[in-house]
Amino acid sequence: MKTESKIDGRVKRSKKIRSDVHQKLILSAIKIIEDDNGKSGVNISAAQLSKISGVSTVTIYSHFPNLQVDLSLSILNYLLDLALHHYNVNLMNNMREKDKLNLIYKGLSYANTKFPFAGSQVYGLLMVGNIFNDNFKNHEFVNIRNNIIQNIFKQENLKISKAEFMRNLSIYVNGTFHAAVSNIDKDKEGEKIFLISSWSKVYENCSKVKLFDIS
């Protein structure tokens, strides 16, 4: 019995350590994106992440085997969780789909204002691939985007069509964008904040492509 208790304790500690390292890596990735002003998108190398986090590249790949896809999804999940806490709601397990979707959309919109660069990069991946890459149909980023979307649907067991999900997401996030613009005159720091964020680039690029083509 004591042996089993010791084993359980070790397993719990091991899981806690792994969870702490995982969050450290996500926060480090967000910092890289923010410090870079979103210029490179969610395009982070294991070496970059290792340098800023102090975690070995071997450990990084154990957390994110498919680095860009897994890291993008983890950042998205982190920002959504952050937003859910911001809205003071519980986990979405028992929610109706309509309410669940509403929180996902609001969460992504909130992420874009809380972390202008990291949030908009994840949104950019969802909508158009790498928003700072002129080749929006770049195969790698289309795959990343589609993997993220598929994971959202799998995790949350959504019945809505992917096209409708993307269309609604666009309406929510663009609404947040317009709210940010409308508040510029009311806040002397507003214009400065808007100009240094990547909102304008996201909005500009989203108008150039078929947002809802997720084939």
How would you describe each model-predicted region?
Residues 84-88, 130-157, 163-170, 193, ...:
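Amphipathic alpha-helical packing segments from all-alpha helical-bundle domains
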Residues 46, 76-84:
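Short, basic, alpha-helical segments at the C-terminal edge of helix-turn-helix-like DNA-binding modules
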Residues 41-43, 118-124, 214:
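Short, hydrophobic secondary-structure boundary micro-motifs
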Residues 24, 32, 39-70, 74:
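Helix-turn-helix
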Residues 123, 154-202, 206-215:
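Hydrophobic/aromatic-rich alpha-helical bundle segments in the mid-to-C-terminal region
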Residues 1-40, 48:
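Basic, helix-initiating cap at the start of DNA-binding domains
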Residues 88-114:
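Hydrophobic alpha-helical connector segments
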Residues 112-132, 178-182:
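Amphipathic alpha-helical segments used for helix-helix packing
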